[in-house]
Amino acid sequence: NIERIKQGEIDLVIGTHALIQQDVEFKKLGLIVIDEQHKFGVMQRTRLRQKAHKPQPDVLVMTATPIPRSLSLTVFGDLDISTIDELPPGRTPVETCRVTAKKENDAYGFIRKEIEKGRQAFVVFPLVDESAKLDLKSATVEAERLKDEVFTGLNVGLLHGQMKSDLKDLIMTDFIKHKYDILVSTIVIEVGIDVPNATVMAIEHAERFGLAQLHQLRGRIGRSSHQSYCLLFATPGSLESRQRIAT
């Protein structure tokens, strides 16, 4: 395929960061579309543009969570901007609420009720394994606890970035096929996941996630006509973290 791209035999190339590597050459690159723009560095985007011969290609960047530099360019740079400010037909806004320690059991009960309706849920943790330095819950430990103590009788799956790609793909496919009611995960599901039947995103230690991460995680639900809910399990934390969660 690399040789066919170089010879111009392929009109449309869809890829990842791998398209930036040196041995990928384009015969006549006319348009670059970068999705999830905040995941690409400035130099990476520049190197991709440099693969084009003159004239320079048109560039379309897309993101739901623009980084500060991108926001500055919309004000001070020479950019044309298009804004998609409405949901696709049939979808409703995701309801977001903060869950305190006292309300944790109530929140778990709510998740179970959603599953009893035939829906599915994500439960996201900031760590894969327990850490001696951080007093935080981990995905691997909590997956077992939730399965044995909280969501007994339900199918609970585990997904994290340290798994091999084939295993991650298998688990995600099984979740899409509704072989799991609940998927316990880390930030690995932040982008590229589409499960219309999932209506709950529960984020443990939400104060440990950045605003863009929270927004991306919430975007994994609300992809059907069913009302969806984002539950932010958070301790008081700093003023900055409280403001981030409130946003």
Question: Positions of the model-derived regions?
Answer:
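Inter-lobe coupling/hinge segments of SF2-like helicase ATPases
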Residues: 1-246
